Amino acid sequence: MALNLQDKKAIVAEVNEAASGALSAVVADSRGVQVAAMTNLRKQAREAGVYLKVVRNTLARRAVEGTAYECLKDVFVGPTLIGFSNEHPGAAARLFKDFAKENKAFEIKAAAFEGVLTDPEVLATLPTYDEAIARLMMCMKEASAGKLVRTIAAVRDQKEAA
């Protein structure tokens, strides 16, 4: 589909705006994936707060100029599907990772977080805010239980020594 200059400028501006406000970005090759599966991926992305766009490589390179995702410029080769996480840094990577398990033709090319190329697997395993709070509370709970056990053991040792 031929795009005129105004359409190209609009696409670059739209992707640049998405990149400017994003927490992380993931680039993938969706060649060979069924249309129904891609529609399902787009639906899941909307629910997860991930902006998805299939972009021409030249337009993608121009769109990320001046953003934290300029490091992805060399990755824009071949069919490019780019996802920007807006609510949680690992959302797009987790979404793409789960989708790649179901669709063997789907290939994750690269991921970026805070202006640095990152392993998509690592980015996908980042805990959500709620998970991080839960882990912190577990650590705090375990620490107090450990103190109680050590205190009781110390009292027991004192009684045995006496």
Curated annotation (Swiss-Prot):
Position of the signal peptide: none
Record's keyword annotation contains Ribonucleoprotein: yes
Pfam family, one: Ribosomal_L10
A Gene Ontology biological process term: translation
Keywords associated with the record: Ribonucleoprotein, Ribosomal protein, RNA-binding, rRNA-binding
Gene3D superfamilies: 3.30.70.1730, 6.10.250.2350
An annotated Gene Ontology molecular function: structural constituent of ribosome
Domain of life: Bacteria
Cellular component, GO annotation: cytosolic large ribosomal subunit
PROSITE patterns reported in the protein's UniProt record: RIBOSOMAL_L10
PANTHER family associated with the record: 39S RIBOSOMAL PROTEIN L10, MITOCHONDRIAL
Family listed: Belongs to the universal ribosomal protein uL10 family.
Function: Forms part of the ribosomal stalk, playing a central role in the interaction of the ribosome with GTP-bound translation factors.
NCBIfam families, per the entry: PRK00099.1-1
Oligomer and partners: Part of the ribosomal stalk of the 50S ribosomal subunit. The N-terminus interacts with L11 and the large rRNA to form the base of the stalk. The C-terminus forms an elongated spine to which L12 dimers bind in a sequential fashion forming a multimeric L10(L12)X complex.
HAMAP family hit by this protein: Ribosomal_uL10
Protein name, entry field: Large ribosomal subunit protein uL10
Naturally occurring in which organism (per UniProt): Vibrio cholerae serotype O1 (strain ATCC 39315 / El Tor Inaba N16961)
Phylogenetic classification of the source organism: Bacteria, Pseudomonadati, Pseudomonadota, Gammaproteobacteria, Vibrionales
